C-alpha cells in the first residue's frame, strides 16, 4: 500500500477553522489569541541555559545517528545568526495561533498536565525525552471522546508543498517519528498535526494514528544512542556530501576540529540512572554546571 493511501487529511478541522474566522472576521480567534500568548513561555524566555540536557524526541527520527549522538554529547554548540533565531522564535509564537484557532471552533485544548507542567515524556533513565505542544478533545476529524496529541509546525513554501503532495510521513519523517514517540509514551491513540505555510498562511492538517512499531523502534534507537560510548557511523565519509555540508557537527565529524571542552566530550563521563551523569575517574555525579565546565583531568573521548 502506498503512503498516499494511508494519509488522513484533517479537512473538517481546517474547514471549520477557516469558516469560523471568516464568520466573525477573526474576532473570536483574536480574543483567544490574547489569552493564549501569555502562556507561550518558550517564545519570550531569556537565556536558553546552554546545551540541552536530554536527547530530544524531535531529533530521534533524523537520518544521521552520529549527528544525534554528537548533539547529546555536546560536541559543538552552534551559534545562529539573528535571522535563524527569529525563525525559531516564530515557531514558538505560531503555537499560540494554532491553539487559538482550535479553541475558536470549540476544541478543548490542554497545554499543561494535571500538575500544571508542560506535557513531557521521558525514556532511557530520563536522558531521552521531549515536550508535546498539547492535548485536545473534540477534533472534528476524530470520533467524539477521542483525546489526541497536538503537534504544530511551520514550513516554507517548498517544504509545505511536499507536505501537501506526499503527506507528513513521507515528506517529514522526523515529525512522524516525534509524534508517534509522544503518543506511545503518553498513552494516546491519535494525534493532530497542523502546519502553516509561512509565505501565505495556508494551513494543512493531518490525523496521525499511533504506529506502535515505529514508536518502539525509535524509542529503542534513542536508548541505544544515549548509552553508546562509541560514535555511530557517518551517513557519508565525504565531507562534501550535501547533507554533511549543512550539518552543525561537520567541523568535528569531518574536519577533525576539537570538540567543545566539557564533561560529555570526555572519555570518563557516563550517562547513568535518574538522568544523571557520572565521572568514572573521580567516581562522582556531575551536575549540569559541572558538565559544562569540565575539569583539569579532561581527556577527550577518542570518538570525537
Question: What residue ranges belong to the model's regions?
Answer:
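Conserved active-site beta-strand-loop modules that form the wall/rim of enzyme catalytic pockets
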Residues: 145-152, 189-193
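Metal-dependent nuclease catalytic regions and adjoining charged, substrate-binding loops involved
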Residues: 5, 162, 166-176, 181-278, ...
Amino acid at each position: 500500500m502506498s503512503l498516499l493511501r494511508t494519509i488522513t487529511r484533517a479537512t473538517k478541522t481546517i474547514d471549520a477553522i477557516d469558516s469560523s474566522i471568516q464568520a466573525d472576521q477573526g474576532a473570536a480567534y483574536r480574543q483567544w489569541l490574547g489569552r493564549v500568548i501569555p502562556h507561550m513561555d518558550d517564545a519570550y524566555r531569556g537565556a536558553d541555559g546552554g546545551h540541552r540536557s536530554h536527547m530530544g524526541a524531535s531529533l530521534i527520527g533524523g537520518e544521521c545517528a552520529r549527528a544525534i549522538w554528537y548533539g547529546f554529547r555536546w560536541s559543538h554548540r552552534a551559534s545562529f545568526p539573528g535571522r535563524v533565531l527569529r525563525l525559531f522564535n516564530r515557531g514558538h509564537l505560531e503555537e499560540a495561533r494554532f491553539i487559538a484557532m482550535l479553541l475558536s471552533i470549540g476544541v478543548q485544548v490542554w497545554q499543561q498536565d494535571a500538575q500544571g507542567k508542560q506535557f513531557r515524556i521521558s525514556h532511557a533513565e530520563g536522558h531521552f525525552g521531549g515536550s508535546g505542544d498539547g492535548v485536545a478533545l473534540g477534533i472534528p476529524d476524530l470520533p467524539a471522546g477521542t483525546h489526541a496529541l497536538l503537534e504544530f509546525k511551520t514550513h516554507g513554501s517548498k517544504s509545505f508543498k511536499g507536505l501537501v503532495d506526499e503527506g507528513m510521513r513521507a515528506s517529514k519523517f522526523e515529525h512522524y517519528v516525534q509524534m508517534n514517540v509522544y503518543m506511545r509514551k503518553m498513552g494516546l491513540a491519535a494525534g493532530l498535526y497542523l502546519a502553516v505555510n509561512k509565505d501565505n498562511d495556508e494551513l494543512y492538517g493531518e490525523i496521525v494514528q499511533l504506529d506502535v512499531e515505529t514508536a518502539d523502534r525509535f524509542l529503542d534507537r534513542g536508548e541505544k544512542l544515549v548509552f553508546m560510548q562509541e560514535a555511530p557511523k557517518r551517513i557519508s565519509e565525504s565531507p562534501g556530501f550535501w547533507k554533511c555540508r549543512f550539518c552543525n557537527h561537520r567541523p568535528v565529524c569531518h574536519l577533525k576540529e576539537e570538540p567543545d571542552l566539557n564533561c560529555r566530550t570526555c572519555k570518563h563521563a557516563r550517562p547513568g540512572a535518574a538522568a544523571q551523569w557520572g565521572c568514572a575517574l573521580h567516581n562522582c555525579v556531575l551536575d549540569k554546571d559541572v558538565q559544562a565546565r569540565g575539569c583539569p583531568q579532561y581527556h577527550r573521548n577518542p570518538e570525537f
